[in-house]
Structures are given as structure tokens and as C-alpha cells.
Amino acid sequence: AGSNDTDHGCALAAKSAACGADALLLVTPYYNKTSQSGLVAHFTAMAEAGGIPVILYNVPSRTGLNIAPETARELSRHPLINGIKEASGNIGQVAKIAALCGDELNIYSGNDDQVVPLLSLGGKGVISVVSNVKPELVHNCCKAWFDGDTAKARELQLEMLPLCDALFCEVNPIPVKYLSLIHISEPTRLR
């Protein structure tokens, strides 16, 4: 659920929960740039409206608004906010979030080209675009890391890079959908 209107976002969160969603992925409000305290109020209201676990989605390149590490720390104290899809592309920021939040906030990579660097900072996985085309590659990369085979994880991360470039030559999800149309990947569908 995502909205730049908190009331509308709360309605979407509640409806998602009522329809059986297990969790909410909540993107930062786009277009209307709020303050960091405004982000706390926005995400808190949406989490409470949904009443189910929340993963924050930080993608400032798309929304124009970044969740600061200190804001992530404050939000991690909410009992329903237990994760962040970190797609800022700033590994230093990810390190600071990890240092501030510890085990209170599960960090997931939102950038397929930074899976292993993020895992090395204590990340729990990736919410991936590449996995729509090569799910086994992304799975095996994460599995290798968690199995302690960092050399294999690094090798698979590097193998992903050309695919990352191809999948982001246009705005997502255009390349993924195109690949499904020409039968290079499984057809995309709602999950």
C-alpha cells in the first residue's frame, strides 16, 4: 500500500489486511515531501490502520523522499514495523540503519546489484526484481551467503550484474513484462 495521502493510505492498509494480506509494504509518500517527523506520523497511522506487520519501502529515486536512519530507528520501535526494503543505493546509510536498529528492524535489499553488500551488514534478504526473471539465481546467491559460502555468494552477485543493467534499462516493470511476453521469463501475475 502506498499513498501520498495518509488517510487514503490508511484506508488501503485496512483494506489490504481485510482482504487477507500477511503484511504491508509501505512506500514513502511521493510528490508531497514531508519532514522526517511527518514520515513517522504517516507510517505509524498506516501501520495501526492495517494492524498487520509492516515493511517500510525506502526508494528515494522514485519518491523523492529518503527515510533517514534515525527515522528508521524511531519507526522500528513500533511493534508492527519490523522491516525495511532499503533501495536508497547508499550502503553507508544501510550500515547506519543496521547500527542504530540492530535486530529490531529486518533490512532487505531493494537493489539487486547490492544484495551481498547489504547481507554483509546483517541484511535478511532481498525483495527483488531480478527474481522475476531468474529466481534461482537470486535464491542461490542468498542461500550461499547464509550457508557461509561468501565466495559463491560474491560470484552469483557478480553474475547478476548484467541482468540488473538489462532490467533497469527502462523503468521497472517494463523490461520484466517484455521478457515474459517474449517467453524469456515466466509470465508475471499477481501473487
Where are the language model's segments positioned?
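Residue-level detector of conserved catalytic or cofactor/ligand-binding positions
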Residues: 180-190
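Catalytic alpha/beta core domains of metabolic enzymes, predominantly
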Residues: 62-168
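Conserved functional loop/turn residues at catalytic and ligand-binding sites
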Residues: 20, 50-53, 79-80, 122, ...
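Generic leucine side-chain signal with a strong bias for well-ordered alpha-helical environments
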Residues: 25-26, 56, 75, 119, ...
